[in-house]
């Protein structure tokens, strides 16, 4: 029996003791990247829609504010704006794209509809030095940035000066060094602006003077105290999916409350080669976490027989998972809390930019509907973290890197990597092909370079020749992409020798396959997964 240390104090907010930056969201598709860039500097950041910005600013008391981009025009009636209290509070403010335009207009400058719209890569010329550029850019230099705007600032507010210009933006960057207000027409948060992260670092560290103490070690200690304060002597059930998020959540909660936690691992028969055994061994044998392992593969595969529509596959798997999990929870009995691996992007995506509910947590793909049905309170220890931070926390908790660093795996598992009807035979073929592919990627030293790689079993057969005989067997598709966030992705440019050797192994070693193809589709227009 593992007994937790008793909490001596309650920690209502894991980030309360740290410097914080508030990010006001005006609807940009890449606002999450701003938060990630700030977090990379060891400073906690939080995103709120502009409608809630004043309330959040008062409650959060941030040391700096960043105004995001957005699709609106400040020239339209009723256009989104930042609370004026932000500009009078004495904190540094950084405006990005729409954030620059609303800052300029609200403080007395002028914005006009652009006759020269800029979308994509653009060159800017640095016309003067400022604190944002220290150690990065110098007067007279030209640099590539990523633009996405129609309107542009044409008259500076009082106290500002222009420090950069571009073909479509005569005032591409503005600076008020006295008030520490800075703004730029381009997007520094995206990788297409090569020096963008350095500019954000300068704003965070040099302009705002923040110390950067938001670390996973600090988060671990504070989250443990928060879990103990919330749970007390209650019991917690955590559904393990075999993925990184639920695994890290379970280990963190177990460190906080010991055997008050019971994990339920539902094996739906759609996992990768030896994955179920790995999960059981890690949690039951290595961490000694109470674990209920349910082999429900026959139930899932029986219900999925004949189902070909990908959305119906997902819904069927989700419904069955809830049924099985609910049944096991009743057997355990006495649980007061349900633990979920909700991440910060799930929280952000459920906040309506245009209005509506303030915050609605998006349910985890496997346990949606469980809290309402089971009448349990939620424990979500990772809800302030991005995926890369969860991996870092996992390493801090001692989870093996081979587990923490695994590529993303969808909740419905191999069901959506097997287009068409799912059968045990097809799943066996797919598991073997996928295992060989990943083994070859690891052997080539490419696993950590690639964001995600997997095999797909296509619902077609082709004619082949093996020895002196004709074959009519399945086609395996190989997929590998590079990405920073999964929002966009490029196919990985393997050399032909690697692809040839991998294809030869799969065809020779996996019975039922006589052809292998490689997917060279980027996202967009394609998605990373096939279904």
Swiss-Prot record:
Q: Where is the active site?
A: 97, 187, 189
Database matches in Pfam families: GATase, GMP_synt_C, NAD_synthase
Kindly indicate whether the keyword Nucleotide-binding belongs to this entry: yes
Q: Where does ATP bind?
A: 241-247
Q: Which InterPro entries does the UniProt record give?
A: Class_I_gatase-like (IPR029062), GATASE (IPR017926), GMP_synth_C (IPR001674), GMP_synth_GATase (IPR004739), GMP_synthase (IPR022955), GMPS_ATP_PPase_dom (IPR025777), NAD/GMP_synthase (IPR022310), Rossmann-like_a/b/a_fold (IPR014729)
The task this protein performs is described as: Catalyzes the synthesis of GMP from XMP.
Name-wise, this protein is GMP synthase [glutamine-hydrolyzing]
Q: Which organism is it from?
A: Afipia carboxidovorans (strain ATCC 49405 / DSM 1227 / KCTC 32145 / OM5) (Oligotropha carboxidovorans)
Q: Which gene encodes it?
A: guaA
């Amino acid at each position: 029996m593992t007994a937790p240390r008793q909490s001596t104090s309650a920690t209502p907010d894991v980030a309360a003791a740290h410097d914080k930056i508030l990010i006001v969201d005006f609807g940009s598709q890449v606002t999450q990247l701003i938060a990630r860039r700030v977090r990379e500097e060891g400073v906690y950041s939080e995103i709120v829609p502009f409608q809630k910005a004043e309330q959040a600013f008062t409650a959060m008391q941030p040391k700096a504010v960043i105004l995001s981009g957005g699709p609106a025009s400040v020239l339209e009636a009723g256009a989104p704006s930042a609370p004026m209290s932000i500009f009078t509070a004495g904190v540094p403010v950084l405006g990005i794209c729409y954030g620059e335009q609303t800052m300029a207009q609200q403080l007395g400058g002028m914005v006009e509809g652009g006759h020269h719209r800029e979308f994509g890569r653009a060159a800017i010329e640095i016309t003067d030095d400022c604190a944002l550029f220290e150690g990065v850019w110098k007067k007279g230099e030209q640099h590539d940035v990523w633009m996405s705007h129609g309107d542009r600032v044409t008259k500076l507010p009082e106290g500002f000066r222009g420090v950069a210009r571009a073909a479509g933006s005569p005032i591409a960057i503005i600076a008020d060094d006295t008030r520490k207000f800075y703004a730029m027409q381009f997007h520094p948060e995206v990788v297409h602006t090569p020096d963008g992260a350095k500019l954000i670092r300068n704003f965070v560290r040099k302009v705002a003077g923040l110390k950067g103490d938001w670390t996973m070690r600090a988060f671990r200690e504070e989250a443990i105290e928060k879990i103990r304060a919330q749970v007390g002597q209650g019991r917690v059930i955590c559904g393990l999916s075999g993925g990184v998020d639920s695994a890290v959540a379970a280990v963190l909660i177990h460190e906080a409350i010991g055997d008050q936690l019971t994990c339920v691992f539902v094996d739906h028969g759609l996992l990768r080669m030896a994955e179920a055994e790995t999960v059981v061994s890690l949690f039951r044998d290595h961490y000694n976490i109470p674990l209920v392992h349910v082999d429900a593969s026959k139930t899932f595969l029986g219900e999925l027989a004949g189902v070909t529509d990908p959305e119906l596959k997902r819904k069927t798997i989700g419904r069955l998972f809830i049924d099985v999990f609910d049944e096991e929870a009743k057997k355990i009995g006495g649980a007061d809390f349900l633990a979920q691996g909700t991440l910060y992007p799930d929280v952000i995506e459920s906040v309506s930019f245009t209005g509506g509910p303030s915050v609605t947590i998006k349910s985890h793909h496997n346990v949606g509907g469980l809290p309402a049905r089971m009448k349990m309170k939620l424990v979500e220890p990772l809800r302030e973290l991005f995926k890369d931070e969860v991996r870092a926390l996992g390493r801090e908790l001692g989870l093996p890197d081979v587990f923490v660093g695994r590529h993303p795996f969808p909740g419905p598992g191999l069901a959506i990597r097997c287009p068409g009807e799912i059968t045990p035979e097809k799943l066996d073929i797919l598991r073997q092909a996928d295992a060989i592919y990943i083994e070859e990627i690891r052997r080539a030293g490419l696993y950590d370079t690639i964001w995600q790689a997997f095999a797909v079993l296509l619902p077609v057969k082709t004619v082949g020749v093996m020895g002196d005989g004709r074959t009519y067997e399945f086609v395996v598709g190989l997929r590998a992409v590079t990405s920073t966030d999964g929002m966009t992705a490029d196919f990985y440019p393997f050399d032909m020798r690697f692809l040839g050797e991998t294809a030869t192994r799969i065809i020779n070693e996996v019975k039922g396959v006589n052809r292998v193809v490689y997917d060279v589709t980027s996202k967009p227009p394609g998605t990373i997964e096939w279904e």
